[in-house]
Structure formats: structure tokens, C-alpha cells
Amino acid sequence: MSSVNVDFEQAGELKIGQVGIANLRIRTLDVPRLVREMQDRVTRAPKLFGRAAVILDFGGLAQAPDLATAKALLDGLRSAGVLPVALAYGTSEIDLLSQQLGIPLLAKFRAQYETAAVSPPPPPPPPPARAEPAAPVARPAPGRMQRNAVRSGQQLYAENCDLTVLSTVGAGAEVIADGSIHIYGTLRGRALAGAQGNPDARIFCRDFHAELVAIAGHYKVLDDVPMDLRGKAVQVWLEQDQIKIAALD
């Protein structure tokens, strides 16, 4: 079984959100380096990143940037070909910075990075009580099935469930699921599984020519996929925050 494990992320970790908005998690305030990396992304995948909306996330830094550095970064990213539209991670410093820059503050992507807070010790158990009838167990949401082709410009979203496509996902089309995605035709567009941050979601496809695949925000574009996997039946999964792709044959 052949697989690929290539990490192109360097100074900034780019994640793709549920509706195609990219989240740039800043790891260093080396503005020229960040701009060069973004220029490289746009050059390698212009249809994906050219004039793409980007949210800047400074939450991974020990200290928020000063206003001059933040302005330089926004200007540099615009020159690289993307459109910074908001700041993520709502600390008071970032809140003030967003006001000074005149752009919104969003917290949509925070859960993908933050570790869960340490829970307090559980309280002592209550005294035994008379048994009550068990509440009915909620059934998981049924998977969504798409029988017809998903054409260029269309977006299909399966909320809180898996998505099965029995036909083709055309170039420029986008299929998104909070669970896994199964495509029984050709995938030429984009497939984003685990859209709400589920790292165990997978993508299965019979004929792989995807513009982009993403799981829990981590992504890989077609140019980064070895030629021997293109046109094959493959599965895509996430391992240690890196996308892996392997043939099913």
C-alpha cells in the first residue's frame, strides 16, 4: 500500500474551514517568511488560494503582535494574493488589535487548537435513589446520500453525519461532511471531511483527481499527491496532524 506523508507547513499552519475560509495560525512573526510561504501556496494552487478569504490566528504566540507588525502582515498577505478578512482567537489583546485594524474578530477555529481545560475532581456520588426508567438513547443522524453528480460551483454539506456520493464530484465542486465522505465516482473537486474538527473522519474515493482533500482542517492539494495515486481508488486519513493518502487496491 503506497502512501504519502509530506508536511509543507512551516511558519504558518493553514487550515481550511467548513465553508472554504482558510485559517492561518501564525507560529512566528517573521513577516517576510509568512508572505513567502503564502505566495508559494498561491502559486502552487491558484484556483484554491488565489483571492481566498483568510482568518489570521495569533493564538499560538506568546504575545500578540504590535499594530505595525500586524499591518505589515496584512499588507504582505494581500500582496501574496489572499484576502485577510478577520482575526481569530478572542483575547482582550487580539480584540483591541482587531479594532485598531478595522477587521472583525472571530473564534470559529479555536476548538481545533485548544486543549480541553483540566476538569475539577468529580463530586462525591449522591446516595442511591430509586431506579428510574432509562431515557431513550438518541439515534445518530443518518448519513446523507447524493445520487446525482455534484457539478462545478455546487457545494454539498452533510451536517453531523457521513456523506455518500454515488456519482462524480466535478472540478470546482465542493463536498463537505462532519463525518466521513464516500465517493463512488470520480473526485475532481474538493472533499472536506471532519468539518467540525473530527480527526477520525476519512475520505474514500474510487477515482482520485481531487483539487483538495481536507480532514479536520488539515489539507493537501493535488500537486502534493504522487502521480501513482492519481486515478486510483484511495483512502485519505489524518495521522499526527498530517494528511495521508493510500491506494485501496
UniProtKB/Swiss-Prot annotation:
* Keyword Cell cycle on entry: yes
Q: Where is the composition biased (Low complexity)?
A: 131-142
Show the stretches that span the lipid bilayer. Answer: none
Pfam families the record matches: MinC_C (PF03775), MinC_N (PF05209)
The biological processes this protein is annotated with in GO are:
cell morphogenesis; division septum assembly; regulation of cell division; regulation of cell septum assembly
Region entry Disordered: which residue ranges?
Answer: 116-149
Q: Which PANTHER family match?
A: SEPTUM SITE-DETERMINING PROTEIN MINC
Q: What is this protein called?
A: Probable septum site-determining protein MinC
Annotated source species: Xanthomonas campestris pv. campestris (strain ATCC 33913 / DSM 3586 / NCPPB 528 / LMG 568 / P 25)
- The gene designation is minC
